[in-house]
Every structure is written in C-alpha cells, then in structure tokens.
C-alpha cells in the first residue's frame, strides 16, 4: 500500500510515498568528504536511479485514475536530499531528474519545504474548479 493518500474533493486520492535511500545519500557525502569527484558522480547517479525506480513503482502501483489523480508524489524527507534530486541532471540527455520523473512516470518530487506549498496549490486549483462549475 501507498504510505499516504491525500483525499481531495470528489473522493479522488493523491498517492504520496516517501523515499530515503540512506546508503545512496551517504555515499554522496562520503565522496564529498574525500573530494573524490568520480565517486561523487557515481553516487549521484545511483541516487537518481533509486528515485527513478521509486517513481516507476509509484506509477505502476498507485496511480489509478479515476480513483486517484493522474500523478503521484514522492516525498524526499530532508532538504539536502531534495536539493540533490532537484539539481541532478542526466549526463547524456541533460534533462533534470524532476522533469524526467514527471514526464515518464507522472511523479512529482517534494521536500519538506515544498510539500505543503504543492498541496496548497492543489487545493486552490480544486477550489477554483468548484467556483467555475458553480458559475456555469
């Protein structure tokens, strides 16, 4: 089961799962401490792969419209992890990880400071739709 499901108007659920591959994240810090650029690139690539796998899993298991939204959220529980993810750019395609996950798997990455803002914007969007439907 998904870790959290946020209920929106109309009983539509937003699937929200958290992910924190500690060893992958720790490897980045270790490489940074050693000033080992090659190890740092390798560690960041492995962290990105872990989140790609998680996004794929969330998409396959929990995104099931019309019961859910057509997207899911993966929560990165620390700001430093969130920053690593939002900064990561695929070396060959030059695409940002966050863009790739949204395009391929319809998954948004949120961190501690962005989750509440993202959920608030969803709420406001649904409120706006409700007002528009009431006006017609």
PLM features: residue spans?
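Amphipathic, heptad-repeat alpha-helical coiled-coil/stalk segments that mediate oligomerization
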Residues: 1-136
């Amino acid at each position: 089961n998904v870790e959290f499901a946020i209920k929106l108007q109309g009983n539509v659920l937003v699937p929200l799962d958290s992910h924190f591959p500690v060893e992958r994240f720790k490897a980045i810090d270790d490489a940074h401490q050693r000033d080992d650029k090659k190890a740092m690139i390798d560690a960041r690539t492995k962290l990105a792969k872990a989140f790609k796998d998680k996004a794929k899993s969330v998409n396959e298991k929990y995104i099931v419209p019309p019961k859910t939204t057509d997207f899911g959220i993966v929560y990165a529980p620390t700001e430093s992890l969130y920053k690593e993810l939002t900064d990561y750019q695929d070396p060959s395609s030059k695409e940002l990880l966050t863009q790739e996950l949204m395009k391929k798997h319809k998954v948004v990455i949120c961190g501690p400071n962005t989750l509440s803002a993202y959920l608030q914007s969803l709420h406001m969007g649904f409120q706006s739709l409700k007002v528009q439907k009431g006006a017609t």
